[in-house]
């Protein structure tokens, strides 16, 4: 039997994101302060497009969306809410929020470094946009998960592919 292992990834659950957007749109449609507003959220492949009448309403759209995402367990570090607001058609404003998928090379190295500094008896392998952690004992793997959950990365980490 092979040793227990898991993968450390940085991904967004697409169905959960779709649900969060749908719930946010439902709340925007029913809220009094959005009556008659042209506010909208569109989910595209690699980004969210937020549209509203003005910057103040756009901030409210972001607040509604962020609250729905948090309730659905989506990590907010994988979304770039700091992009600039640009004018759109019909006197509206638009913001494109980039969705980050996977870990970059530097991020995988940082995860690997933190695990190796812990001196736990596990093997760490970088596999493209993820990191595979293998160990003889499940307790060591659980300690690694606890360590990574408490680490302050500029991206969200999830744990998948438990074997």
Swiss-Prot record:
Top-level taxonomic group: Bacteria
The UniProt record lists the keyword Cell membrane: no
SUPFAM superfamilies reported in the protein's UniProt record: YajQ-like
UniProt KW Glycoprotein keyword: no
Keywords on record: Nucleotide-binding
InterPro entries registered for this protein in UniProt: DUF520, UPF0234-like_C, UPF0234_N, YajQ-like_sf
Physiological role: Nucleotide-binding protein.
Record PANTHER family: UPF0234 PROTEIN YAJQ (PTHR30476:SF0)
Family affiliation: Belongs to the YajQ family.
NCBIfam families named among the record's database cross-references: PRK05412.1 (NF003819)
Name assigned to this protein: Nucleotide-binding protein LBJ_2391
Lineage: Bacteria, Pseudomonadati, Spirochaetota, Spirochaetia, Leptospirales
């Amino acid at each position: 039997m092979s040793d227990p292992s898991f993968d450390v990834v940085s991904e967004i659950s697409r169905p959960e994101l779709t649900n969060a957007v749908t719930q946010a749109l439902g709340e925007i449609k029913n809220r009094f302060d959005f009556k008659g507003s042209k506010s909208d959220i569109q989910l595209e492949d690699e980004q969210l497009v937020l549209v509203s009448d003005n910057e103040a309403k756009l901030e409210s759209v972001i607040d509604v969306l962020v609250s729905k995402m948090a309730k659905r367990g989506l990590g907010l570090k994988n979304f770039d809410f700091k992009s600039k607001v640009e004018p759109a058609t019909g006197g509206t404003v638009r913001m494109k929020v980039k969705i980050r998928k996977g870990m970059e090379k530097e991020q995988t190295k940082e995860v690997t470094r933190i695990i190796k500094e812990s001196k736990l008896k596990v093997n760490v392998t970088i596999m493209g946009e993820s990191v595979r952690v293998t160990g003889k004992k499940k307790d060591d793997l659980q300690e690694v998960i606890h360590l990574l959950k408490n680490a302050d990365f500029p991206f969200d980490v999830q744990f998948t592919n438990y074997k």
